[in-house]
Amino acid sequence: MNFVGISSLVIVAFFAGGNAAWKPFSPEETLFTYTRCMEDNAKGDLALAKKWMAWKLEADQKSACYAKCVLVGLELFDESSKTFKGDHIVEQYQKYKSYTSQDEAGVKKFQQAVQALGTIDSANCLKVLQKYGPVHAQFTDVQRNVYFGKKEITDKIYNSDYTVKKRDETMFRFCERSNFKDGSEELCTLRKTGITTNNNHLDCLFRGLRYLDRNGNINPDEIKRDLHFINVKDKDAAVDNALNNCKVKEATKATDYNDCLWKDPNLKDIMMPVFDYREVRSESYRYFIENTDPYDVAKVKEKVKKYDKDAGC
């Protein structure tokens, strides 16, 4: 249920818009899920996180909640109905099967095993892991093959897919490379002000930051989380107000929300430090797993200067 060699895991960051039919998870999405669940449940305990990286799940509270978090994130467990879901496992496998030697028969057995778990009477972390644990133990290798738990699989994707986000590349620079010419006035203005009319870029960025979820819905909690990380904890209501009063068109959703945040009188002075720190952290999804240092605005600015230079600005 976890992954090996996460530090070398590559990221494919193709984010499509709209409420379309279900789409297989990319390596970027699974990596984000794994690391965010580690961040939330290991809470600075690197030794424990390393156990999860080694696919070791013990029956303790933190490990159980990590496991449940990943299952929910990969849509293998629906918390509201307390039901295990294997509906899309084969579809997930088929999307990337050319990158793995995994046979489909094994995937179907894994799917059947997940489906057979059915509904449980409680979504308690320990109850979820107790139920899923035997399936995890039996199909660990299949899970790693299907949900990008092997470096050799992700390396192949990294080397062959033009949409691959490079190792140690920030989400901001990835989206910028796809939508602007380095050194262009438009890009440099964006990096100085946070404002652009390029909706393709902002859609890529908002999805990459999880400000928009997989279905294209705004996620206020993720924005507030980023404010909290720069020690701004009294603006939650301002975020809600800015988003709730934002006039949004489907075709320009990301641009509209971005404008509403950056131009709000209660938020305009903090959005740049929010974005700067998130850019630094997006360079490695393991940032908070390995880095326990408090927010340091001077260090963040030094890092951002390097990103600006890389952008030709």
UniProtKB/Swiss-Prot annotation:
Keywords: Allergen, Disulfide bond, Hemostasis impairing toxin, Platelet aggregation inhibiting toxin, Secreted, Signal, Toxin. It comes from the Eukaryota. GO terms for cellular component: extracellular region. GO terms for molecular function: IgE binding; odorant binding; toxin activity. It is found in: Secreted. Residues 1-20 form the signal peptide. Disulfide bonds join 37-69, 65-125, 175-204, 188-313, 246-260. Its main location: secreted. Distal lateral and medial lobes of female mosquito salivary gland (at protein level). Expressed in the head and thorax of the female mosquitoes, where the salivary glands are located. Expressed in salivary gland. Not detected in the female mosquito abdomen. Not detected in the male mosquito tissues. InterPro entries: PBP/GOBP (IPR006170), PBP_GOBP_sf (IPR036728). The keyword Signal applies. The amount of D7L2 in the salivary glands of 5-day-old Culex quinquefasciatus is approximately 36 ng. During the blood meal, mosquito injects approximately 10 ng of D7L2 into the host. Lipids and biogenic amines bind independently through different binding pockets, with lipids binding to the N-terminal pocket and biogenic amines to the C-terminal pocket. Belongs to the PBP/GOBP family. Modulates blood feeding of female mosquitoes on vertebrate species by binding and sequestering different mediators involved in the host response, such as biogenic amines and eicosanoids. Binds serotonin, histamine, adrenaline, leukotriene C4, leukotriene D4, leukotriene E4, arachidonic acid and U-46619, a stable analog of thromboxane A2. Does not bind noradrenaline, leukotriene B4, ATP or ADP. Inhibits agonist-induced platelet aggregation and hemostasis. This is Long form salivary protein D7L2. It comes from Culex quinquefasciatus. The gene is D7L2.
